[in-house]
Regions:
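Mid-domain Rossmann-like dinucleotide-binding core that forms the NAD(H)/NADP(H) cofactor-binding site
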Residues: 80, 129, 142-229, 233, ...
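Residues in the short beta-alpha loop(s) of Rossmann-like NAD(P)-binding domains
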Residues: 209, 287, 324
Length: 402
């Protein structure tokens, strides 16, 4: 099959690799019809992680079941499914509590597993024609009948829609409240969209890319361009000097100041200053245990100079970490199905797998108009019209659940 393979920093290419196979009776093989390039893929693309050469990238995946292991009970060939980016077993101590982002089974020695991502285990990614999904009954969200026509909406359930929603959950956004969001990338836009759905009274979002700020305004946010205005001062002006009720951090360790210099603590400290006393923060931007290639000594050790004294004095609460996708994806799926949510508004490009290496270059450069890239491993027509799934031929016959 064809797949996007990581060769090294800023070097990915389409290669022919072996098809995945059923390795456990609970596995399923998914014929990937839509897969996204995620902003966090750029951490690996830029060489800021220890991703091994030869790894298939891609953790935002949607497709049709092509093959089922003998123990799979709820899925059948042809079903459209969306796969959470964090793979989980469903039966460990954390999974039983709904904390699927910290599964203790699939990545021995640490908490949390995922597809095609550094430090998250051996699973390959889904920027490919096929993907093996362990514990298929648990990990696959079966999609409604309109999935073939609305793949660009439903694929956002793999990561960024639940992650944006998670940011607002961690922050505790309630109807009528004000919320400040730092970062208008795909996750920040989904946080703004989630806040709008929840009925937030005032949504503010900080970035400096005009195309992203324009999208933020489409979901009811006041756009703050921090290359032109002091973001903290602007937030205080919009909130009668009090600060926002809630704050969301959707940037992570790659934060830059308005002059374009990488400053890892830039956003976190501004967020603390932007939220009112006794407010709360949701931090979903990726922060690394260590960042050896950073130009900042503290960041190389996974640390930052953080205004904890101000956080404490203001009595702020803070929630952090990866989203537990399965905690949200089913009811967010229903919002899409019922026409209450359309997260595909952020999609800027629909490309073939062969176009992905060039797309990575544009997306990494944050070029104007490159907001969210979706890839079609089976070609545009197969993805958009729901082409029938041919049964994959393997050396072993597997039961296909009905």
């Amino acid at each position: 099959m064809k797949a996007i393979v990581y060769n090294g920093p800023r070097d990915v290419e389409v290669k022919q690799v072996p098809d995945p196979t059923i390795q456990h009776p609970n596995d399923v093989i998914v014929r990937v019809t839509t897969t996204n390039i995620c902003g966090s893929d750029l951490h690996m693309y830029e060489g800021r992680t220890d991703l091994e050469q030869g790894k298939i990238i891609g953790h935002e995946n949607l497709g049709q079941i092509a093959e089922c292991g003998s123990a799979v009970a709820s899925l059948k060939v042809g079903d459209y499914v969306c796969i959470p980016f964090n793979a989980a077993c469903g039966f460990c101590k954390n999974c039983e509590r709904g904390l699927t982002s910290a599964c203790l089974t699939l990545n021995p020695g640490t908490a949390g597993a995922g597809y095609g991502y550094a430090g998250m285990g051996e699973l390959q990614g889904g920027q490919a024609e096929y993907l093996r999904v362990p514990y298929g009954d648990f990990n696959c969200l079966k999609l409604p009948e309109d999935a073939a026509e609305r793949e660009d909406d439903y694929v956002m359930l793999a990561d960024i829609f639940p992650t944006g929603w998670h940011a607002t959950e961690l922050a505790g956004v309630q109807p009528g409240e004000s919320v400040i969001i730092y970062g208008a990338g795909p996750v920040g836009l989904m946080a703004a969209y989630s806040a709008q759905i929840k009925g937030a009274g005032l949504i503010m979002i900080v970035d400096r890319h005009p195309d992203r700020l324009a999208l933020a305004e489409k979901c009811g946010a006041i756009a703050i361009d921090d290359s032109k205005d002091d973001a903290v001062i602007r937030v205080l002006e919009l909130t009668r000097g009090e600060g926002a009720d809630r704050g969301c951090e959707c940037v992570g360790f790659h934060a830059h100041d308005p002059q374009g210099n990488e400053v890892p603590n830039e956003v976190m400290n501004k967020l603390v200053k932007s939220v009112r006393a006794t407010g709360s923060l949701g931090v979903v931007g990726v922060f690394m245990p260590e960042d050896p290639k950073s130009s900042h000594e503290l960041a190389r050790k996974g640390r930052m100079a953080f205004d904890f004294g101000e956080l404490w004095t203001k009595g702020l609460r803070m929630g952090t970490g990866q989203t537990n996708v399965k905690a949200y994806n089913r009811h967010l799926c229903q919002l899409i199905e019922l026409g209450k949510a359309k997260p595909s508004f952020i999609v800027s490009h629909q490309l073939s797998l062969e176009e992905a290496p060039d797309a990575y270059k544009h997306f990494d450069a944050r070029e104007n108009g490159w907001t969210k890239v979706v890839l079609r491993p089976q070609g545009h027509s197969a993805a958009s019209k729901g082409a029938p799934v041919a049964r994959r031929k393997t050396g072993t016959q597997h039961r296909h659940a009905h």
